[in-house]
Curated annotation (Swiss-Prot):
It is a single-pass membrane protein. InterPro entries: Cyt_P450, Cyt_P450_CS, Cyt_P450_E_grp-I, Cyt_P450_sf. It is found in: Membrane. Heme binds at residue 454. Its cofactor is heme. The chain crosses the membrane at residues 2-19. Pfam families: p450 (PF00067). It comes from Dictyostelium discoideum. Its main location: membrane. GO terms for molecular function: heme binding; iron ion binding; monooxygenase activity; oxidoreductase activity, acting on paired donors, with incorporation or reduction of molecular oxygen. Gene3D superfamilies: Cytochrome P450 (1.10.630.10). This is Probable cytochrome P450 513A1. Belongs to the cytochrome P450 family. It is an enzyme of class 1 (oxidoreductase).
Length: 509
């Protein structure tokens, strides 16, 4: 009992010491009142994106919350977020460093690290994400992965039985990222599919855990009393899985080198080759190599897959929209044949059983599908609140002074469901993007905003469009129980995970 009283006394003294030192920090910014020591943390459990949306409606585009002793400002609506992350990019560019994240990889991964290491990793990865290389992958690897998956889906379609597509789509997305990163992929026979499915489940589990606030990140004195073993152990399993992939890559690469396979330039090799070369040159640490590979495969696979799944969910719940998309794709194919000479590739496309419709070839020919994809990005942003930033200096925004050292949250979910910019924001209305005006597109921040936006956005655009166009061209998707709409409420985490729904797929021809 005396121990507990002493503990409470220490926390109370510590709290009032902090209050005395930062009582004027961001004090002019409105926001919900918190409680001593914890601030607003008790109100931030569960679906945090919905709570931040609720506070936005109450306090406006800029409001202040206290996460323990961490001063936090939440920004909502595109003009404000743009002013911060583009107009004042130097002040907002850095990531907020949470101690729990630093424990995972010493803070040396692409997503979290700041400064020179981040610039080095970003330059390295972007050098591999060129439009030319992505276009090459569209016509080779993405095309091949779609055909492999469709052979599996054809078998399910022939049975007429309901199927849950989540793991199939996530495995497809994971294979795309694995090829870019490691130059390898899983096949769909059940032995490897089950192994990949276990990793997918692990990845989703980590994203869900990591999306929730860890109290000791915001009240450091509580660290000895907070159990983070599940969080740390889940990441360790991902780390070990990724380390095995790197070892496999190194072993296979050494075999190729031993048989004088030197015809492949570094530019044609996967990203891991450049990461390992930078490590051997002493430019980055081993933690940076492994953790950056983890960033690429977890974030890259999960975000694209969830967008594809949410889009299919809406097309099933709105069969009239699905019909319009199919008609749009059919017209695009006809127009493509009329506009182009019938070269060898085109002849192959006409005669092959499985047709893939690439982003670079069809995106301008299928405008309605493009609007559907944008509406999916709007209604279901993969990162509902983004990853937190921190101000490096005092800065004025919208008439308020935001102090240096303030954690900054991009309120993406509330921005995308903002009635000022999107009428009927909770409805799926692709036609809202029928205008080609730049303002209609610029209100979306699903890939983030500013110099630290999503590094793989070009690959994601290509993968998502190509997969959806090819899926809808080949299959009709329906609800086994049409009287009950499919569940569209996802699970909050670092990414907004699509719920599992049983659906029926039927070949169109």
């Amino acid at each position: 009992m005396n121990y507990l009283v002493g503990l409470v006394l220490i926390f109370t003294i510590f709290y009032f010491f902090l209050q005395k030192n930062d009582k004027n920090m961001n004090s002019k910014i409105p926001g919900p009142k918190g409680i001593p020591i914890l601030g607003n943390l008790l109100s931030m459990k569960g679906d945090l994106h919905l709570k931040l949306q609720e506070w936005y409606k109450q306090y406006g585009v800029i409001y202040r919350i206290k996460m323990g002793n961490v001063e936090t400002v939440v920004l909502t609506e595109y003009p404000i977020i743009r002013e911060a992350f583009i107009g004042n990019s130097n002040s907002f560019v850095n990531r907020f460093q949470r101690k729990s994240r630093l424990k995972l990889n010493n803070g040396e991964n692409l997503v979290i690290v700041n400064g020179d290491i981040h610039n080095k990793l970003k330059t390295l990865v972007l050098s591999e994400m060129t439009n030319q290389r992505i276009k090459k992958y569209e016509t080779s690897f993405i095309d091949n992965e779609i055909k492999k998956l469709f052979k599996v889906l054809d078998e399910h379609a022939d049975t007429g039985k309901p199927i849950i597509l989540n793991n199939h789509i996530k495995m497809f997305s994971m294979n795309i990222v694995l090829c870019f990163t490691f130059g390898l992929n899983y096949s769909y026979p059940y032995d490897e599919f089950e192994k990949a499915s276990e990793f997918i489940k692990l990845m989703v589990e980590f994203f869900n855990i990591a999306g929730q606030p860890i109290i000791s990140d915001f009240i450091p004195s509580l660290e000895p009393f907070i159990d983070t073993s599940n969080y740390l152990n889940t990441y360790k399993r991902i780390f070990n899985y990724t380390s095995d992939l790197i070892t496999k890559f190194k072993n296979e690469n050494e075999i190729h080198n031993n048989i004088n396979d030197n015809n492949k330039s570094l530019a044609d090799k996967p990203i891991l080759s450049k990461l390992l070369q930078s490590f051997e040159n002493g430019e980055i640490s081993w933690d940076s190599v492994v953790s950056t590979c983890i960033d690429l495969q977890t974030a890259g696979a999960d975000t694209s897959a969830n967008t594809i799944l949410y889009c299919l969910l809406e097309l099933i719940n709105n069969p009239n929209i699905q019909s319009k998309v199919y008609d749009d794709i059919k017209q695009a194919i006809i127009q493509s044949k009329e506009n182009e000479n019938q070269n060898d590739n085109e002849n192959q496309e006409q005669t092959e059983e499985i047709i893939t419709l690439s982003f670079n070839k069809y995106r301008t020919l299928a405008p309605y599908l493009s609007m559907v994809v944008k509406e999916t990005f709007r209604k279901y942003p993969s990162g509902t609140i983004g990853l937190p930033h921190v101000t490096s200096e005092d800065v004025e925004l919208n008439g308020y002074k935001i102090c240096a050292g303030t954690q900054i949250i991009q309120n993406i979910w509330a921005t995308h469901r903002n009635e000022k910019q999107f009428s009927e924001p909770d409805s799926f209305i692709p036609e809202r993007f029928i205008s080609q005006q730049q303002s209609a597109n610029s209100n979306l921040i699903h890939f983030g905003c500013g110099v630290r936006d999503c590094i793989g956005k070009s690959l994601a655009d290509s993968e998502i469009f190509t997969m959806l166009a090819s899926l809808i061209n080949r299959y009709e998707f329906t609800n086994p129980n049409p009287s009950t709409p499919l569940n569209e409420i996802g699970k909050f985490g670092i990414t907004y995970s699509c719920p599992e729904n049983k659906i029926i797929i039927k070949k169109r021809f």
